[in-house]
Design a protein with these regions (language model features):
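Substrate-binding/active-site groove segments that recognize
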Residues: 140-149, 187-202, 223
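Bacterial N-terminal signal peptides
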Residues: 8-16
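C-terminal soluble interaction/assembly domains
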Residues: 242-346
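An acidic, Gly/Ser/Thr/Pro-rich helix-cap/linker signature
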Residues: 23-111
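Short, functionally critical alpha-helical segments immediately adjacent to catalytic or ligand/cofactor-binding
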Residues: 41, 52-61, 116-132, 165-170, ...
Length: 346
């Protein structure tokens, strides 16, 4: 792990904290659970109480973050086709091809080094931040403090991310009050959570920094590194369109994205693949629902499951699949992409 991270260096120069952001929130430094967290950080990682009291004294509770966590986009829309339309449209495909052309060398290198197709990496960046245009407007300390101490459903997870964020800030020698990201505390072009930033961010442009805010090359290499570390299989597809009949398929769909069944077993569940797949291929069945319309069904493989490690939503992973397919189709000079895993005209 490098002692400095370019994202935080850039943030230090670019962001200013206004007087409103410096106002004390009601009670963070005085709350028992915050005091216990500070004591643990002092004991385990050598922070001083003074510096952490300063940080938590200026961290602000953000009720809008709780609202966003309670109603994420896929839940609010309750429709695969509506969710898909946000990310797969001519404007985002055109912007993605431009991003691809600008970063062709880094993408080719990542595909060779990590085995992840270029269009998958571009697709992730397109879904996450519209190719780096929208990296978030919340202070990361506000997001993580709100979720660590005021969102009991996932407090344990976000306290771990808060711990990683404070360590990352110290390693970068930057004030943790100055960094901005998503409502969940994700950072930079690829929207890495702090724990993933510390584990998987790489310096891919050779400047000595792992800079996920301003370096597309570092973002590209870091995504490839993340996916490979989570089990991406070089040369294997993500998934295929499928048709279902009867009721046996429901058992597969309810089991989730873990590829637990052999392709040869699928006909016994009433599942028919759109393309031939080797019989021993491990796979899962995903149903993508749109009210008032027939569902889309996909037989998904290990690489789809890996995409759900990046964001644990089948809708998200399917959107990355489809955007990647459209990007590969639109990119001049590429071989024909694999068959569209969704509907023929979707």
């Amino acid at each position: 792990l490098k002692a400095r991270h370019g994202f935080f260096v850039a943030a230090a120069l670019a962001l200013q904290i206004g007087s409103a952001a410096a106002a004390n929130p009601p009670g963070y430094p005085q709350r028992r659970e915050v005091k216990e967290f500070i004591a643990e950080m002092v004991k385990r990682h050598g922070f001083t109480r003074r510096e952490l009291n300063r940080v938590f004294g200026k961290a602000q509770f953000q009720p809008a973050i709780i609202k966003a966590m309670e109603q994420p986009a896929e839940t609010a829309l309750a429709s695969w086709q509506a969710y898909r339309a946000i990310f797969i449209n001519p404007q985002r495909v055109e912007a993605g091809v431009q991003f691809w052309n600008r970063n062709a060398q880094s993408l080719a290198r990542a595909a060779s080094e990590f085995g992840v197709p270029e269009e998958i990496i571009v697709g992730i960046i397109g879904v996450e931040t519209t190719y780096g245009r929208n990296i978030g407007t919340y202070r990361v300390i506000d997001a993580l403090a709100t979720l660590a101490f005021d969102y009991p459903k996932r407090a344990q997870f976000f306290r771990g991310e808060l711990e990683n964020y404070l360590m990352l800030s110290r390693e970068a020698k930057i004030d943790p009050l100055r960094v901005k990201g998503s409502y969940a505390g994700a950072i930079g072009i690829p929207q890495f959570m702090p724990g993933s930033y510390r584990r998987f961010a790489v310096d891919y442009d050779g400047d000595g920094l792992s800079d996920l805010a301003t370096s597309p090359a570092d973002a590209i290499g870091s995504i490839g590194n993340f996916l490979k570390a989570h089990g991406w299989i070089r040369g294997e597809p993500v998934g295929f369109a499928a048709e279902v009949s009867g009721e046996g398929w429901r058992k597969l769909a309810e089991a989730g994205a873990t590829p637990a069944n052999r392709a040869a077993e699928l006909p016994g569940f009433g599942v028919k693949l759109a393309v031939p797949v080797p019989p021993d291929t491990r796979c899962a069945l995903i149903e993508l629902e749109t009210p008032g319309q027939p569902s889309d069904f996909r037989v998904t493989l290990q690489n789809f499951f890996v995409l759900t490690r990046y964001n644990r939503s089948n809708l998200y992973a399917a959107a990355v699949m489809d955007l990647a397919t459209e990007l590969a189709r639109a990119k001049p000079g590429l071989p024909a992409p694999q068959p569209n895993p969704g509907r023929e005209n979707s």
